[in-house]
């Protein structure tokens, strides 16, 4: 880690922007989704929970594009690491991009748009929690797939800055998981309990 930090200017504006984007995104969607769950204000404002969820999902997608742009600009504005700058390591980076892409895309296909973008906070629930691939091999595959993509992108660019930012992405996702998982479990437990009472 000390060796990585020797390559990274922590005060460089692109790096600071990337850090802010990485931290802000999950904070934004968790705060807004919890607020919606408690107040239903977004659903009321947009006329339906589904439209409100689509709108929040669109905002999250745009924020993710911004985060990826900031991440890339931060890497390009700082030095490359010579020991990472070789064909073997480059191909490892490509493999990570591919694996991460598979996890992200298959998660989206398994969950659908509303499942991916916090539909459960809007009262849009699946029949049960999704357990098919990739959820059958990994918890939170969207988050870990995204982390693998950032790691692969950093390696392809031989970027110590990218590696450091990827570590931050992973840390922020771990915090988000601790915050989100109990809530999701509680929602589906309540749904199962209500279904049991009706039967």
From Swiss-Prot:
It is a multi-pass membrane protein. The keyword 4Fe-4S does not apply. The keyword Ribosomal protein does not apply. InterPro entries: PEMT/MFAP, Phopholipid_MeTrfase. Keywords: Endoplasmic reticulum, Lipid biosynthesis, Lipid metabolism, Membrane, Methyltransferase, Mitochondrion, Phospholipid biosynthesis, Phospholipid metabolism, S-adenosyl-L-methionine, Transferase, Transmembrane, Transmembrane helix. Its EC number is 2.1.1.17, 2.1.1.71. Residues 13-33 dip into the membrane without crossing it. One of its GO terms (molecular function) is phosphatidylethanolamine N-methyltransferase activity. Residues 67-93, 179-199 are cytoplasmic. The first methylation is rate-limiting. One of its GO terms (biological process) is phosphatidylcholine biosynthetic process. GO terms for cellular component: endoplasmic reticulum membrane; mitochondrial membrane. It catalyses: a 1,2-diacyl-sn-glycero-3-phospho-N-methylethanolamine + S-adenosyl-L-methionine = a 1,2-diacyl-sn-glycero-3-phospho-N,N-dimethylethanolamine + S-adenosyl-L-homocysteine + H(+); a 1,2-diacyl-sn-glycero-3-phospho-N,N-dimethylethanolamine + S-adenosyl-L-methionine = a 1,2-diacyl-sn-glycero-3-phosphocholine + S-adenosyl-L-homocysteine + H(+); a 1,2-diacyl-sn-glycero-3-phosphoethanolamine + S-adenosyl-L-methionine = a 1,2-diacyl-sn-glycero-3-phospho-N-methylethanolamine + S-adenosyl-L-homocysteine + H(+); 1,2-di-(9Z-octadecenoyl)-sn-glycero-3-phospho-N-methylethanolamine + S-adenosyl-L-methionine = 1,2-di-(9Z-octadecenoyl)-sn-glycero-3-phospho-N,N-dimethylethanolamine + S-adenosyl-L-homocysteine + H(+). It comes from the Eukaryota. Pathway: Phospholipid metabolism; phosphatidylcholine biosynthesis. Residues 1-12, 34-45, 115-157 are lumenal. Belongs to the class VI-like SAM-binding methyltransferase superfamily. PEMT/PEM2 methyltransferase family. This is Phosphatidylethanolamine N-methyltransferase. It comes from Bos taurus (Bovine). The gene is PEMT.
